[in-house]
Amino acid sequence: ADVITHYIQHTLNWAPERIFSTSTTLDSARLRRAIAQETGIDQKSITAYALGEHGESQMVAWSAVTIAGKPLSQWRDEYPDTFGKLDLDALADAGREGGWTILRGKGCTEFGIGASAAEVVRAIFYNENRVLSVSVLLNGQYGQHDVYASVPAIVGRDGIAHIIELHLTPEEQEKFDASCRTMSDNYQLSLTL
């Protein structure tokens, strides 16, 4: 989705804030659901984002995950016997691999992406200025240039109103950079087709 979005923006030469994709909107929702299932806390009280590619190289900004406004790291410190035992890799996999699990089970995944697309359309139509993890053109944000990647952004009537830069840990930034390199390489390849 990210590379195709970049290719469309390049081909049409439209304003980048008008060309974006759902990318990890659904993956982020699946991640929040997985965290909710493991913690017993309603997913509406959880903020968590899958960043980068909608695919294998996506990563989770664990340092930005909050539950009821409190950082996940604080929950883990305060409740080591419960939150401290959360398997972050398994939770990230649940967000990334959720679609494959559904596909293997029923042969299609139209409802999840349909719901995510409806979320984006609703944010635009009703000018909600809602924060969603969508693929946007980065030009300086997160240290990236001329690459579409999924990050939190405010979505409203005019498309992308603002790209939100999370403060990533050095390890998270490395993973995000690697994901962006993957997409940039694939985008450059698409230009040769």
Language-model features: where?
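Gly/Ser/Thr-rich loops at beta-strand to alpha-helix junctions
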Residues: 1-5, 23-28
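Short Gly/Thr/Asp-enriched flexible loops that form oxyanion-binding sites at enzyme active sites
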Residues: 4-12
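C-terminal substrate-binding/catalytic lobe of Rossmann-fold NAD(P)-dependent dehydrogenases
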Residues: 12-18, 27-193
